[in-house]
Amino acid sequence: MRTMGLDLGTKTIGVAVSDGLGLTAQGITTVRRTSLKADLAALATVASEHEVTHVVLGLPLNMDGSEGPRAEASRKFADTLAQSLGVTVELWDERLSTVAATRTLLEADVSRARRREVIDQVAAQFILQGWLDAHRPPDTDYHPDDYDSEP
């Protein structure tokens, strides 16, 4: 079971996918938006290739937690995507995900041109990782004492 995370923008959709254990998120691609039909087809291809069973879509809330027009558009897209893919689509607070993604890329000394190419998928990765961390059962935390250091 893999989960796909999405950062929905007006021009692009950042896409990330979890590992098979649901522990980590990896940025996969950025979909250039052309039409709803093409967007859904591109996301269906990624979902099929990675055996996605659940989708987490970033919900762009205002800093005070209220919803604006972008949040309403995300809700509508989530409904359409759920019907198109036949999977559950869950909305997840995406506040500051792009800021965190930009900061991470700057700290990694990624060039401006490369940042433009990957910023949306890194933001999707932050959204998905936040969701994965929040939904991880408490007994799956890693404790070094639980493992032998000897081979």
Curated annotation (Swiss-Prot):
GO biological process: rRNA 5'-end processing
Localization annotation: Cytoplasm
Pfam family, one: RuvX
Protein keywords: Cytoplasm, Hydrolase, Nuclease, Ribosome biogenesis
Keyword Transport: no
Annotated Gene Ontology cellular component terms: cytosol
Superkingdom, natural source: Bacteria
Alphabetized Gene3D superfamilies for the sequence: YqgF/RNase H-like domain
Main location: cytoplasm
EC id: 3.1.-.-
Keyword Hydrolase carried by entry: yes
MF (Gene Ontology): nuclease activity
SUPFAM superfamilies: Ribonuclease H-like
EC class name: hydrolase
PANTHER family associated with the record: POLYNUCLEOTIDYL TRANSFERASE, RIBONUCLEASE H-LIKE SUPERFAMILY PROTEIN (PTHR33317:SF4)
HAMAP family: Nuclease_YqgF
Free-text function comment from the UniProt entry: Could be a nuclease involved in processing of the 5'-end of pre-16S rRNA.
UniProt similarity note: Belongs to the YqgF nuclease family.
Protein name: Putative pre-16S rRNA nuclease
Organism annotation: Myxococcus xanthus (strain DK1622)
